[in-house]
Swiss-Prot record:
Keywords: Aminoacyl-tRNA synthetase, ATP-binding, Coiled coil, Cytoplasm, Ligase, Nucleotide-binding, Protein biosynthesis. It holds the Pfam family Anticodon_1. ATP binds at K522. This is Valine--tRNA ligase. ValRS has two distinct active sites: one for aminoacylation and one for editing. The misactivated threonine is translocated from the active site to the editing site. Its EC number is 6.1.1.9. Monomer. The gene is valS. InterPro entries: aa-tRNA-synth_I_CS, aa-tRNA-synth_Ia, Anticodon_Ia_Val, M/V/L/I-tRNA-synth_anticd-bd, Rossmann-like_a/b/a_fold, tRNA-bd_arm, tRNAsynth_Ia_anticodon-bd, Val-tRNA_synth_C_sf. Residues 808-882 form a coiled coil. It comes from the Bacteria. A motif ('KMSKS' region) lies at residues 519-523.
Amino acid sequence: MTELSPKYNPAEVEAGRYQKWLDADVFKPSGDQKAKPYSIVIPPPNVTGKLHLGHAWDTTLQDIIIRQKRMQGFDTLWLPGMDHAGIATQAKVEERLREQGISRYDLGRDKFLDKVWEWKDEYATTIKEQWGKMGLSVDYSRERFTLDEGLSKAVRKVFVDLYKKGWIYRGEFIINWDPAARTALSDIEVIHKDVEGAFYHMNYMLEDGSRALQVATTRPETMFGDVAVAVNPEDPRYKDLIGKNVILPIVNKLIPIVGDEHADPEFGTGVVKITPAHDPNDFEVGQRHNLPQVNVMNDDGTMNELAGDFAGMDRFEARQATVAKLEELGALVNIEKRVHSVGHSERSGAVVEPRLSTQWFVKMDELAKQAMDNQETDNRVDFYPPRFNDTFLQWMENVHDWVISRQLWWGHQIPAWYNAEGEIYVGEEAPEGDGWTQDEDVLDTWFSSALWPFSTMGWPDTDVEDFKRYFPTSTLVTGYDIIFFWVSRMIFQSLEFTGRQPFQNVLIHGLIRDEEGRKMSKSLGNGIDPMDVIEKYGADSLRWFLSNGSAPGQDVRFSYEKMDASWNFINKIWNISRYILMNNEGLTLEEAESNVAKVAASEAGNVTDQWILHNLNETIAKVTENFDKFEFGVAGHILYNFIWEEFANWYVELTKEVLYSDNEAEKVITRSVLLYTLDKIVRLLHPIMPFVTEEIYAQYAQGSIVTVDYPVVRPAFENEAAHKGVERLKDLIRAVRNARAEVNVAPSKPITILVKTADSELEDFFTSNVNYIKRFTNPEKLEISSAIAAPELAMTSIITGAEIYLPLADLLNVEEELARLDKELAKWQKELDMVGKKLGNERFVANAKPEVIQKEKDKQADYQAKYDATQERIAEMKKIKS
């Protein structure tokens, strides 16, 4: 047995420990075929850069689950991996190249992809280093990457199979276009923001010049693609105009007036311009009326040759130029400023352009129905908290076909080939013969990520051991922000291709926010690097904070004050452990367990030993129950209370009555209970704090704590009588301590304590444990009886089953106390005067921030409460004096 260092130093505790775990292969599945499998696939982080605090939270929760299940005897697999993150990673690499004055087009596809692979290797190494510092118990022998050949094979098979079923198709439709990244986006990759904009009202003159029709748009630059104006066929103002033409301003070409219910007579003038290549609703109108589709924009957001004099302009520059020209021609009626919702690319931040484009799509109706129906079966996915099941179903009910092609180079190239005759070949391998060219587009990143739970297990080979044993996986841990992006897609793809749910449970957590509740972001500059936190506090402190503040579905606020509290708690555990082990006298864990069994059988020990074992039992039961419900925050509070309050503050202190005695036999029992309880605490904490618990465990046991048994409830430890008795004992001691504090009497001053109880069992219990009462209350005189009469002037405390009297004459000198209270009253009056003066200052109230004013008001209320309480104490003292 070695000795813990005098001071807890997380850097020393954690240094080299992770590599020792890896060298010992303790993170791999046990391979025990009799053990029940439990598997988790890590949500693969993007290889775009370093991991943030949200990743640290997400992976900490997974590690807690897998470490506990490993200790409980499950055959555990936690499979790690990373995502190629097509658009995000490509954007990062292009940004790096731009700094060197190079574009991807300068390099060409192959050389550019070489650069991206270099980036991937660089950041994959960084991510794995971060995982190590976090202590994640993943099995690196099964590490996967979404562009691995095995996963690529699965992607190709899924694409081909869905294509053959008619559920993947290629067509020209309005899609969300990112002009910065020059690629299509799915609906959920578009973030809508309220921005200041305008409705531009303009007149389109009838061909005969008899009148003008007024239309309005937020995007006047698209008018060069107008092919009609629409009115409602039932609108009496315009129904006679259907079939006639208007003159498109600037362009001076004739476009027809069509009757279509898309035009709402109640909205605006009831006339809408129709631009089928640049608006999804207009596209539908165009389809119904067989209108041409005129695309007036290049893929980089500049205007093309169909915009005439405005060709080559950026779309926003063209907007202003178009408006100026309309005004010059007298066609601009007015500009109506307003705030409206505008779609932005989730990745590049660019304003998204609705644009006609030929893309590949997944037909979603059957896949969505299958996923929704499955939630009514035993094969369903259970969401924690359950409300997210409704979120999932609501999205599936309203889902649109999924655009899966991306105009990128980094990703899974679409397995479709074209020849000069216009034929399309879709297959897992390239077609035989010459003259075929593969589609240059790649698949949406989420297409491959949707296959992650089963492609990582070897699918489409369903005979491999990992797929048969560990799929479906047990639990997925992820944030609520990607339920639509990822969770939903994994569910419907897994059901379609394996017939099983991808995971049995989904634990949904929230977002990490700053101390003020704001989302962490680069723009706010409030992001926190988890590695900086680990360097200062250690990984265990960060993990404790992340788990202890965690409730399913809820956000968590980060603060350094909370990190200080986390470190302090671990330091407390360290100091308790050091105290116990220094007083252990060579006792082994096996000997301690044998002696504890005697305590449970009432063959040795005392009531406080029985009490702590009973409470340990309850703690194990409650922590295990809350872990099973993924209520890690609740479990953390239970552990904290047991360790700090019941074990450290009470039991460890109570044991000094024995350890400082001459009774060697009792000392052995007490040391045994201390070591046994410490061991169970360390095991309970290990899933959350792996480093410090391994260090403590190594002081009294052989091997690694990673694979030892998790604590279980022992019925023999249940002892309600001991629990009840010691709780009353604690109540008595607390009551005396509180009374001393209330009248400012030092703990060192002996006092008279009278305990009156009509409960004979409680009287016997207090009497037989009088040494504990004396040790904690320092009485000059202690009397316990049912016949005690209440003194006339005494501090009285009532606890369950007893009344406690502390005669005031023994407690204080009334004259000295009155003098002290007068000084205290003057202090509170001074504080009240100062804060009252500040709040009475009109300039201060007018100029100070609301939160500053509220802070002063809170101080005023606090000082007033203290002033009033002091006045009450003075009145009590004067009553005693008289």
